[in-house]
């Protein structure tokens, strides 16, 4: 049997941004309560040695899984230091990877309603839009 490789997109991220992400997730899960239903998996709960953490975010009947990695090969810049993030959208047996911009839009669509319903229309018309 021959080897089969699966390629996964991992975004190289500064470790301080990963720490900020983890603390932001924990704040919204345990303090503000805006992240109801989110599940945080620590590195010691994962069988994979490179996984630093996983956050499972329910989006209707699907979910977004954000996995942080450590110990990867260093990137082009010194500050990468082998840290990375992969973002996956899963629904039943189907999964696909998404980019950080789409993940941000999905999370804000379901959990953080920052603007009123008419904000998009006002923005398109050139009016100033402010959060609630």
From Swiss-Prot:
One of its GO terms (biological process) is viral life cycle. One of its GO terms (molecular function) is RNA binding. Zn(2+) binds at residues 108, 114. It is found in: Host cytoplasm; Host cell membrane; Virion. Transmembrane segments: none annotated. Residues 75-114 are annotated as: RNA-binding. InterPro entries: Vif. Induction: Expressed late during infection in a Rev-dependent manner. It is a peripheral membrane protein. Residues 40-44 are annotated as: Interaction with host APOBEC3G. Signal peptide: none annotated. Residues 14-17, 74-79 are annotated as: Interaction with host APOBEC3F. Keywords: AIDS, Host cell membrane, Host cytoplasm, Host membrane, Host-virus interaction, Membrane, Metal-binding, Phosphoprotein, RNA-binding, Ubl conjugation, Ubl conjugation pathway, Virion, Zinc. One of its GO terms (cellular component) is virion component. Required for replication in 'nonpermissive' cells, including primary T-cells, macrophages and certain T-cell lines, but is dispensable for replication in 'permissive' cell lines, such as 293T cells. In nonpermissive cells, Vif-defective viruses can produce virions, but they fail to complete reverse transcription and cannot successfully infect new cells. The BC-like-box motif mediates the interaction with elongin BC complex. Counteracts the innate antiviral activity of host APOBEC3F and APOBEC3G by promoting their ubiquitination and degradation. Acts as a substrate recognition component of an E3 ubiquitin-protein ligase complex: mechanistically, Vif hijacks a host cullin-5-RING E3 ubiquitin-protein ligase complex (ECS complex) and the transcription coactivator CBFB/CBF-beta to form an active E3 ubiquitin-protein ligase complex that targets APOBEC3G and APOBEC3F for polyubiquitination, leading to their degradation by the proteasome. Belongs to the primate lentivirus group Vif protein family. This is Truncated virion infectivity factor. The lineage of its organism: Viruses, Riboviria, Pararnavirae, Artverviricota, Revtraviricetes.
């Amino acid at each position: 049997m021959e080897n089969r490789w699966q390629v996964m997109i991992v975004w190289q991220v500064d470790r301080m941004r990963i720490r900020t992400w983890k603390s932001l997730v924990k704040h919204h899960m345990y303090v503000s309560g805006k992240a109801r239903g989110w599940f945080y998996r620590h590195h010691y709960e994962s069988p994979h040695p490179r996984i630093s953490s996983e956050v499972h975010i329910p989006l209707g009947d699907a979910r977004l899984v954000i996995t942080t990695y450590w110990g990867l090969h260093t990137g082009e810049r010194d500050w990468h230091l082998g840290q990375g993030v992969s973002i996956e959208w899963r629904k039943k047996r189907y999964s696909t990877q998404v980019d950080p911009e789409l993940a941000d839009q999905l999370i804000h669509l379901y959990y953080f309603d920052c603007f009123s319903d008419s904000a998009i229309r006002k923005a398109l018309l050139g009016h100033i839009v402010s959060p609630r």
